[in-house]
């Protein structure tokens, strides 16, 4: 009987959640998958392993094995790699992102800060927004989930604990989706408006969920 109630509840809640399928693509380097399930544009790029590895080589020395933590990235890590550095690649993605919106051409992009978030089982990032014009999240490590199939039968609203990132806007409105969720994958780099509400749900499992985030400001021509 409980199982029937849970299944019915999950089906009824599903109608408020958009699918995580890309609505379009930009074929630059790296390619961008584009998501606009409820108005604001979400772009997702897949960066190469060596790009992730450069950041992880620094982060591995800073994370705690027994507790969640956050720390800023220093300039030498941010600019390591020249034109293939974290800073240059992030600026490039932001410029391409802006061209795909209705914003004028960016005259100047200023990335204010990069930071790393390290989290373990049971830890969430409550829904929040950022202070910049454009923000992003890059996944550096993902955990091994327990009872993954069971968790994926649920939604964010019904208490899923699979570590997904969730983007939300508005509330319950007719003819409109309210949220979209993405499963973290190493190398996935999401770009989105800094004001867009988002959060990471907790997960059950072994290992670390590690991500990089940034805030950037844009001056238009």
Place the predicted regions along the sequence by residue.
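Non-heme Fe(II)/2-oxoglutarate
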Residues: 5-105, 113-125
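Catalytic core of non-heme Fe(II) oxygenases with the double-stranded beta-helix
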Residues: 113-191, 208
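Histidine-centered metal-chelating micro-motifs
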Residues: 123-124, 195-199
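Ligand-binding loop in jelly-roll beta-barrel domains
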Residues: 200-211
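Double-stranded beta-helix
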Residues: 215-221
